[in-house]
UniProtKB/Swiss-Prot annotation:
Family stated for the protein in its record: Belongs to the MurCDEF family.
Pfam families the UniProt entry points to: Mur_ligase, Mur_ligase_C, Mur_ligase_M
GO biological processes: cell division; cell wall organization; peptidoglycan biosynthetic process; regulation of cell shape
Gene behind this protein: murC
Localisation per UniProt entry: Cytoplasm
EC number annotated for this UniProt entry: 6.3.2.8
Molecular function as annotated in GO: ATP binding; UDP-N-acetylmuramate-L-alanine ligase activity
Residues annotated to bind ATP: G109, A110, H111, G112, K113, T114, S115
Organism of this sequence: Streptococcus pyogenes serotype M5 (strain Manfredo)
Keywords: ATP-binding, Cell cycle, Cell division, Cell shape, Cell wall biogenesis/degradation, Cytoplasm, Ligase, Nucleotide-binding, Peptidoglycan synthesis
Function: Cell wall formation.
Cross-referenced InterPro entries: Mur-like_cat_sf, Mur_ligase_C, Mur_ligase_C_dom_sf, Mur_ligase_cen, Mur_ligase_N, MurCDEF_pg_biosynth, UDP-N-AcMur_Ala_ligase_MurC
Reaction catalyzed: UDP-N-acetyl-alpha-D-muramate + L-alanine + ATP = UDP-N-acetyl-alpha-D-muramoyl-L-alanine + ADP + phosphate + H(+)
An example Gene Ontology CC term for this record: cytoplasm
Name under which the protein is recorded: UDP-N-acetylmuramate--L-alanine ligase
């Protein structure tokens, strides 16, 4: 039976994906959010989903309300629902109930969730009818689907309502210092989550913290080293992607190619292969569809403006920065790697300042944008982007949206824009600068 859903905070990456999924399943969907443009809204607009400004008038008694995790009692729509005792569900609670209708495949981990969820979704949907929800704002819903692939987020332990049949865990790392107290707290959260997985876990076997995880379901380890249950080996990394074989219990289960770059993407693919092997999916079909994966939004997304290569990536943690730069060097080994990075949240910048500097030193030159504070925090003046610049050994300087012209001081370069805030504003300024230079030279 068709329902009407109203999403409070519909532009959030998970929320927009869920909205698209429910829309495609035949339900009426609308939502509200701030006016500021966010990259997820294009997909919503293309689907014909109405996006409204926040207003009490948006809510009617016949609707099912789904509320984004960032929106609290100070939001006018949430306050209205509470005042009038209109029931609503948080995103993660709704998802926990929704997945019960499917055989579910979850992807958790500090880094690589979205890319791995995208890869798993791509392969499975090309083999059989599959619904999926990806953290880049992409979702697909089918009422006839047997399988459901989704991203499982550890922040504020939002993954605790989830009880999937299968789950990949890509890694454990200290992040979200505004919530987690340290690496032990992060590990404990993942351990609690792992205990809820029903059939099997697929865990990166070279992560010391992950190896401490215990769960009732079988745990399969994947990685590069002997001793793992699924081992990627005979690896060739080229400018066209990565080729490798995977063996399980001493037997080769397939030879694979992914048109993706960086060691981390080989690991992501190996996790997907391991999960689908245990789930009984034909490895020849898996190999066929791995070859055609085109990536996910804001994860090593490339464009060329007037012969200048620009890469856009969501990387906002030191581990992710290192992985993104590694991928850029694999694809463009003869080019200078110029990193343009915007720190995301003051708490993360303070907690990981030294690690950020070390990671950014992997680039040849570094430009920094002003720190992007989250809606949950206040700038107390405890850290400035200049503090990070001072710790970077490679050539570095701070740029503004209004003046990105220092980026032109490079020949034969690849420009890698990284961040989870509004780094795309800097990217767009640079693109406009390049376009104007071309016009002036004509």
């Amino acid at each position: 039976m068709s329902k009407t859903y109203h999403f409070i905070g519909i532009k959030g990456s998970g929320m927009s994906a869920l909205a698209l999924m429910l829309h495609q399943m035949g339900h009426m969907v609308q939502g509200s959010d701030v006016e500021k443009y966010y990259f997820t809204q294009r997909g919503l607009e293309q689907a014909g989903i109405t996006i409204l400004p926040f207003s009490e008038d948006n809510i009617t008694p016949d609707m099912e309300l789904i509320v984004g995790n960032a929106f609290r009692e100070n939001n006018k729509e949430v306050a209205y629902a509470l005042r009038h005792q209109i029931p609503f569900k948080r995103y993660h609670d709704f998802l926990g109930d929704f997945m019960k209708s499917f055989i579910s495949f979850a992807v958790a981990g500090a880094h690589g969730k979205t890319s791995t969820t995208g890869l798993l979704s791509h392969v499975l949907k090309n083999i059989t009818d599959t619904s999926y929800l990806i953290g880049d704002g992409t979702g697909r819903g089918s009422a006839n689907a047997q399988y459901f692939v989704f991203e499982s987020d550890e922040y504020e332990r939002h993954f605790m309502p989830y009880h999937p049949e299968y789950s990949i865990i890509t890694n454990i790392d200290f992040d979200h210092p505004d919530y987690f107290t340290g690496i032990a707290d992060v590990r404990n959260a993942f351990n609690d989550y792992a205990k809820q997985v029903k059939k099997a876990l697929f865990v990166y076997g070279e992560d010391d913290e992950l190896k401490k995880i215990e769960a009732p379901a079988p745990i399969y380890y994947y990685g590069f080293e002997e001793g793992n249950d699924f081992i990627a080996y005979d690896i060739t990394r080229t400018t066209n992607g990565s080729d490798f074989k995977v063996k399980h219990q001493g037997e080769v289960i397939g030879q694979f190619h992914v048109p993706a770059y960086g060691k981390h993407n080989i690991l992501n693919a190996t996790a997907v292969i391991a999960n689908l092997f245990v789930a009984g999916i034909d490895m020849a079909l898996v190999a066929d569809h791995l070859k055609t994966f085109s990536g996910v939004k804001r994860r090593f997304t490339e464009k060329i403006i007037n012969d200048t290569i620009i890469i856009d990536d969501f990387a906002h943690h030191p581990t992710e920065i290192v992985a993104t730069i590694d991928a850029a060097r694999q694809k463009y080994p003869s080019k200078e790697i110029v990193a343009i990075f915007q720190p995301h949240t003051f708490t993360r910048t303070i907690a990981l300042l030294e690690d950020f500097a070390c990671a950014l030193n992997e680039a040849d030159s570094v430009y920094l944008a002003q720190i992007y504070g989250s809606a949950r925090e206040v700038d107390k003046g405890e850290v400035k982007v200049e503090d990070l610049a001072a710790k970077i050994i490679k050539p570095s300087q701070v740029v503004t949206v209004e003046n990105v012209s220092p980026l032109l001081d490079h020949d034969n370069a690849v420009y890698v824009f990284m961040g989870a805030g509004d780094i795309q504003l800097y990217e767009h300024s640079f693109e406009e600068l390049l376009a104007n230079l071309t016009k002036n030279n004509q």
